[in-house]
Amino acid sequence: MHESSFYRITIDNKSFIVEFDNPNNKTLMVVNNISLEGKTVLVTGAAGFIGSNLVKRLFNDVKNIKVIGIDSITDYYDVNIKYERLKEIEAIAEGLIHDDSCSMENPWQFVHASIADKEAVEKIFTENKITVVVNLAAQAGVRYSITNPDAYIQSNLIGFYNILEACRHHEVEHLVYASSSSVYGSNKKVPYSTDDKVDNPVSLYAATKKSNELMAHAYSKLYNIPSTGLRFFTVYGPAGRPDMAYFGFTNKLVKGETIKIFNYGNCKRDFTYVDDIVEGVVRIVQHAPEKQNGEDGLPIPPYKVYNIGNNSPENLLDFVTILQEELVRAGVLPNDYDFEAHKELVPMQPGDVPVTYADTTPLEQDFGFKPNTSLREGLRRFAEWYARYYEN
């Protein structure tokens, strides 16, 4: 992948980043810049898979930053993994306190609460000057939404409304929030583009994520809140969610149980490694949609939506084969493991779709970035983490 060249310029007292996104054609991209230096960032879902990796990345990239994390730590999956993630964050933050280059007295603050708790959310905003909000808190899982709808209404709708209201009353420079590739529903056209219609969700989870995009657009229009929605595609990696296929399959294979491969293996997923997701989030967080007025003098909503995916869907059977090979390589499974005896091909489950495939052209054009971690490399890192974590 080519290296981009960035230059900071100032026009009419506004700071911009100018990027040559390709040294061969010298195409220019100009986007607003938000400096995170000396600022406070709120990350919701901070004990979650993406949230915890984002917090660690922010501390790695910006020495003088305060990050406030909020998470309800539900038992939707093993809470020990969530506490382990928080422990890693706390260790990094403790190191920053003793770093002479860090002027923040307390760079990390964790709030154990749900974003559906309006008072808890308001308290965070009242007591802190929040610059950027990254809303990653949500009840995840397509299949779980079929049997447990209440959890999705509370976290994904009421919780997101509370975040929007807080951003409305306490001016923030940028609201970035997690949407999902599931909003594309049963769309037949691939790759999925953010220009496609997404009016026919096939699960309640997808419906709540589409609702988030609509709510954010309304608040951007009414209250001029710069917001960016991110449609994530099948995120995986070390210390991930045990309910995801790669993690769940591994747990079952280790126990000698049979794994169910849906749609008889005729599924394709745009598996996206967590570090690539975080890279996209970090770039987008610092570049808010510009506030401007239209020809009628009324504000144009400072609102954007991007896909973050690998732009390379993998067949589920190929995915399982690579996972098995890497689990053997890492010593999680023995060399003579009988994989065929532990596979069962079953029909498609309600709420699932046969293919996910991200068109990442806007992400590449606006930020010069495209996820590029191969599935084998990503699953190798997961397998190595799994071997270490469960050995201990």
Predicted regions span which residues?
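Residue-level recognition of oxygen-bearing side chains
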Residues: A120, A151, I158, K197, ...
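A glycine/serine/threonine-rich, flexible loop-to-helix segment
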Residues: V190-P191, P242-T250
